Amino acid sequence: MNSETLFQRSKQVVPGGVHSPVRSFSSVGGTPIFFSEARGAYLKSVEGNDFIDYCLSFGPLLFGHRHPEIQEVVEDTVNKAWSFGACEPYSLELAEFITERIPWVEKIRFVNSGTEAVMSALRVARAATGRNKILKFDGCYHGHLDQLLVKSGSGLAGLSSSDSKGIGPEIIQNTLVLPLDDESKLEELFQREGSNIACLAIEPLPANYGLLPQRIEFLKKCRELTTKYGVLLLFDEVISGFRVSFQGMAGITGIIPDLVCYGKIIGGGFPVGAYAGKRELMDLVAPSGPVYQAGTLSANPIGMRAGLKTLTKAWTENPYPALESATKQLTDGILTLLSEKGDTNWEAVTFGSLFWLKGKTENPIRRIDQIPGTHKSNFATLFHKLLKQGVYLAPSGYEVGFLSTAHTNDIINLTLEKTKKALKD
């Protein structure tokens, strides 16, 4: 059994051979690796080869693959129940744990993905304001719901397209799009459309079209204008929530949203999303209010208990400073090795345990139109050199990398040894 054979078989029965576009390697070329096992910082391919993993399932695995403490909880849960479709104590425990530690999360509803979370939060925003228009930003990805799949990132970036076919103009006619980091255009739009906008949705740390940290002044302007015009501010913290700090970007910046969406880490490696916010907004959700949202597997016991164990460890152990330091150690080491080989055209953007290797630019990149045109092909070359040595990055130059607590000092040093070998090719 090998990846090439499996990929050809998969293409016969699965669109493009994959269940999420970026996995196809279409952005970097070549045949995607099929993996069969994972533990700690490592993936094992079906061929039996080990790879140091810096994709980490695109972010959920704060403590690495199959952390023993989390696995123990999962196995215990599997022996008790898989799904109830009824009330259970586990989601209550997780909800209480979060609301007691994040003041702006007064109530929370669990769903099965970040896409579901954002979709539901927008519904709440429209109901609460009586308005229909949604404002988003070019390059911010909020899942594959129709209204926000406009000028997005994630897999669409790798496909050289910012929109999806099959979304009618009548669906997105109420979607407004602006570039990031442009306060004047933001003010102009609010002066013109402010009374019609239900919600401003933003990744406070855009991380789906590269890593584009925003100026605090821009995020403050989003909060200022939404408050002034009665627009709800939605922070999409599916990636940044519990990843850059326990309280996410809202906690770091002190900018408090009306609604917030979570995913990835909140489920401890299982498919869980959540939307949350002020009590008066969340009380609009059925059955307490008129905004309908439901799900067969929402708050499934495996995801709830894995999530609670993960967040408990994150809260009590506070791995964030060490992860930030390890991320800098990794990226500084890679850049040094590239420079020693005479390639000084790279730099790294880091934020906490997220990193993005990119072409060097004169000024920090905050918008997607500032990304060098050569980035995609340059990254693809570096990706395959590292892959050949057993280092696995996300297979797109527009996806970010992640570290976990499983990425010890020894593993980072081994990664740098492998990088040195890769650059000799």
From Swiss-Prot:
Write the record's keywords in alphabetical order, separated by commas.
Answer: Cytoplasm, Isomerase, Porphyrin biosynthesis, Pyridoxal phosphate
GO biological processes:
protoporphyrinogen IX biosynthetic process
Q: What's its top-level EC category? A: isomerase
The reaction(s) annotated as catalysed by this protein in its Swiss-Prot or TrEMBL entry are: (S)-4-amino-5-oxopentanoate = 5-aminolevulinate
Question: What pathway does the annotation place this protein in?
Answer: Porphyrin-containing compound metabolism; protoporphyrin-IX biosynthesis; 5-aminolevulinate from L-glutamyl-tRNA(Glu): step 2/2
Location within or outside the cell: Cytoplasm
Source species, domain of life: Bacteria
Where in this chain does the entry annotate a coiled-coil region? none
Q: What is its main location?
A: cytoplasm
Obligatory cofactor(s): pyridoxal 5'-phosphate
Show the Pfam families listed in the entry.
Aminotran_3
Q: Which CDD domains match?
A: OAT_like
Q: What is its EC number?
A: 5.4.3.8
Named from the GO MF annotations, one term is:
pyridoxal phosphate binding
In terms of InterPro entries, this protein maps to: 4pyrrol_synth_GluAld_NH2Trfase (IPR004639), Aminotrans_3 (IPR005814), Aminotrans_3_PPA_site (IPR049704), PyrdxlP-dep_Trfase (IPR015424), PyrdxlP-dep_Trfase_major (IPR015421), PyrdxlP-dep_Trfase_small (IPR015422)
PTM annotation (N6-(pyridoxal phosphate)lysine): residues: 264
**Gene Ontology cellular-component terms listed:** cytoplasm
Tell me which family the UniProt entry assigns to this protein.
Belongs to the class-III pyridoxal-phosphate-dependent aminotransferase family. HemL subfamily.
**Assembly with partners or alone:** Homodimer.
What the entry lists under NCBIfam families is as follows: PRK00062.1 (NF000818)
Record protein name field: Glutamate-1-semialdehyde 2,1-aminomutase
Organism per entry: Leptospira biflexa serovar Patoc (strain Patoc 1 / ATCC 23582 / Paris)
Gene (name only)? hemL
